[in-house]
Structures are given as structure tokens and as C-alpha cells.
Amino acid sequence: MKRATRQRLILLLVVVALLVLAGWQLRRDAQGEPGTLLALDPHSISHITLTLSGSPTMHYEKRDGHWWRTDGTPERAIDGRLAELADTAAARVLSWRPASDFDPAKIGLAPPQAILTLDGQPLEFGESSVTGPQHFVRVGQRIALVSLHYTPRSPALKTTELH
């Protein structure tokens, strides 16, 4: 075997080994991904309940592709705002910890600042984290850290978009 052929073969083996290692690392990283808050598709959610601290509970239901507030006389809600709340189900979790690792009062979960219930699955929102723009969210017996972007706001309030 010529020297040039042997060098190309060694180079090819090194490239194949690097590709195998990169594939293994990507698969390992994907398995370690914390996932989302809930295993619900935001588009399939049909019932939302929102309780903000100091406010009465608001109930919403999706009918014929539009959101309706069902407290008292049913009235149309702002679809975009309710879609934002439904999107919270798919919020990317930065990290999960057992609820037993925290004192609920110290992270704003005794009582929670907001309770968002999506198709019967409650999400309890606490204080912002001191480590960055994140919120503590209790989901069952676990606490998640999620972006502040997913902090529930009242869908009844109109907002102005800045351009």
C-alpha cells in the first residue's frame, strides 16, 4: 500500500470515528433534555382556568375554533391571548427538581402567584428566580424553571404592541 493511500485511509477512519462520537453525543444530549411543562399539544387544549393572585378565577372554553369566557354570560375572548396561555403547556423547561427540595413560601408558591389549569392539569407559578429571567412552576410533585415569557397574564386585558 502506498504511503498516500494509507494516510487517506487513516484520515477516513478518523473522520468516521468523529462522526460516530458526534452522533452519540447528540443522542445523549437529547435524552438529557428536560422537556416541556406538560405532555399536551397546545392546539388540542379546550379548557383553560386562570387564577391570578387577588383576582377571581377566570374560566375559558374553546368552541368552534374560538375562545369564550364562560363565567356568567358567555362572551368571546381574545383568541391570541388564550393561545399564549395554551402555549404554556409546551414551554421548554430549563430544569426540573423535586418539590421537596424547596420551601414553597421562599419561591412564591405558598400561595402561588398564579394557577393556570390546562385541560385539568394545574400549573402553579411562583416567584422569579434570582439566577435569571425565569419562574418557578410547580407541576405535581416537581418544580420547573421556565422562561418569564410564560408568566400568565389576564387575557381580559388588552395590550398594545410596540413596533
Where do the language-model regions lie?
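A short-motif feature that recognizes glycine-rich, charge-decorated loops
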Residues: 1-163
